[in-house]
Structures are given as structure tokens and as C-alpha cells.
């Protein structure tokens, strides 16, 4: 885990409200933008967002490789946004595939998204519920010194739990910004993340390059500091959380 756990070591516990009843002194937020690599215009707009935005790029998109290089050059953290069942396509993981084929697809996807520091799942409500496949995945990510973000597209996911078992650098998404694609709803979800960060010490947000989402983020992200939020890179967030589950995802720091 030392490979990626840098920068926020001074904030060893971001969730004292879940352990000792005290209000957290710090409130951290991290943001991931998913589904990138499809549109140069949307990609460029996501890249231009202020602060340490993590860019999750889909391998089966026409601009995946070029945008990954561009994002890395700009100093952004790049992630592979790995398609998983019910997602389809040549890279998608499905429960009926043997581990050898899953490995082949992971290798091919990583080649399409150079500089990926970690992965998160695209869709995957069925695939992330498969313990054998997730156990293999987290072991492989650990071997490659990559981290995992469990997008938690299903309550049945075991991805983060399997990562925690072996000590893989990982964390889970807390808030989806844009399940409802209106500016009002997206702004509301952003404020939900702010409140959650103040309550438990940290919040991980995932959004998409929809015009409505990007417009809200362009307007609101610069205001986070005034709301008492410290906006940090996803790798710093892994360090802050120390691989512990939040109350919504587990008990006493252990994923359920």
C-alpha cells in the first residue's frame, strides 16, 4: 500500500465520529469523473476542472489512450474505468468467463489506458458480486501496485471487502452526483457529499461528463474551501481512510 498511500498521512483517521463520538476536525472530499474517452470536448472540459480531479477512462472508447496521456501530462490521476457485467464489449468482465479470459481482458484494457494508477468498475452490478473473480482481481491489482475504487453499483458488491481482506489500497464511493441529470439534483448531491464529509470526515464522489454535471462542478468546486472542505486526490483519500469502511458500508471499519 505504500506505493499509493502518500500525502495525507497526517490525517490518519478521518472518521472519528464513527469510533469515538466526536465530530471530525477535518472534512475531506475526492472526486472521480467516470466514462471518459468518448468525446474530446467533454474530456477536455473534465480535464479543465479545478483541483485534484481523478479521471476514469473507459478502454473501449476512441480517445482512451490519447486522453490518458494528456491527463497524465497535466498531472491528473488516471484510472481505468473497467467495464463489468452488465456492461458489454470486448473488455467487459462477465461471470461466465474463466479467470484466464478475465486476465486477458484486464491486460488489454490497461494497455488502452496508459498511466492508470488504479481501477474502478463501470456498471458491474453482477460482476462485483462474484467473490472468486473479485478475489482474483484484488490480488492481481496488488501485484501490479494498482489501487481499487469500488463504485458500489450494487449493494451486493464484494469488491471492497475482498480488497480489505488482503490489504489492497482501496476505498468505496459514497455519493453519485448525477443519477438525476438536472442542475438542481446535481447541486443537491454535491451538498450531500459536503454534509457527509463533515459528519464522517470524508466523502468520495463520482460524476460523469454530462453537460449539467460539468456546469455545476465548474461553478461549485471553487467554493468547497469556504464550506470547510479540503479537496484531496483519490490516493490521498485512500491514506486518509486507511482501508476502513464507512458506516454506510460496514461496521467498525470492516466491510460487510
Range-by-range predicted roles:
Residues 7-256:
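Catalytic-site microenvironment of enzymes
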Residues 1-7:
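Bacterial N-terminal signal peptides
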Amino acid at each position: 500500500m505504500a506505493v499509493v498511500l502518500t500525502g495525507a498521512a497526517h490525517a490518519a483517521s478521518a472518521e472519528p465520529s464513527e469510533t469515538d463520538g466526536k465530530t471530525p476536525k477535518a472534512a475531506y472530499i475526492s472526486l472521480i469523473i467516470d466514462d471518459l474517452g468518448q468525446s474530446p470536448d467533454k474530456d477536455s472540459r473534465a480535464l479543465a476542472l479545478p483541483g485534484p480531479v481523478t479521471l476514469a477512462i473507459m478502454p473501449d472508447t476512441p480517445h482512451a489512450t490519447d486522453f490518458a496521456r494528456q491527463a497524465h501530462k497535466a498531472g491528473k490521476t488516471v484510472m481505468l474505468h473497467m467495464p463489468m457485467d452488465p456492461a458489454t464489449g470486448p473488455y467487459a468482465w462477465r461471470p461466465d468467463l474463466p479467470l484466464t479470459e478475465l486476465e486477458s481482458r484486464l491486460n488489454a484494457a490497461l494497455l488502452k489506458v496508459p498511466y492508470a494508477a488504479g481501477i474502478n468498475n463501470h456498471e458491474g452490478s453482477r460482476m462485483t458480486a462474484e467473490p472468486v473473480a473479485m478475489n482474483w482481481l484484488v490480488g492481481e491489482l496488488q501485484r501490479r501496485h494498482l489501487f481499487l475504487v469500488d463504485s458500489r453499483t450494487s449493494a451486493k458488491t464484494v469488491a471492497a471487502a475482498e480488497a480489505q481482506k488482503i490489504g489492497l489500497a482501496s476505498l468505496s464511493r459514497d455519493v453519485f452526483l448525477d443519477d438525476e441529470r438536472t442542475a438542481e439534483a446535481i447541486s443537491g448531491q454535491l451538498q450531500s457529499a459536503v454534509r457527509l464529509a463533515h459528519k464522517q470526515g470524508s466523502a468520495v464522489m463520482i460524476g460523469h461528463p454530462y453537460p449539467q454535471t460539468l456546469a455545476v462542478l465548474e461553478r461549485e468546486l471553487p467554493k468547497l474551501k469556504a464550506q470547510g472542505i479540503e479537496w484531496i486526490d483519490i490516493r490521498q483519500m485512500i491514506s486518509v481512510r486507511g482501508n476502513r469502511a464507512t458506516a454506510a458500508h460496514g461496521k467498525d471499519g470492516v466491510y460487510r
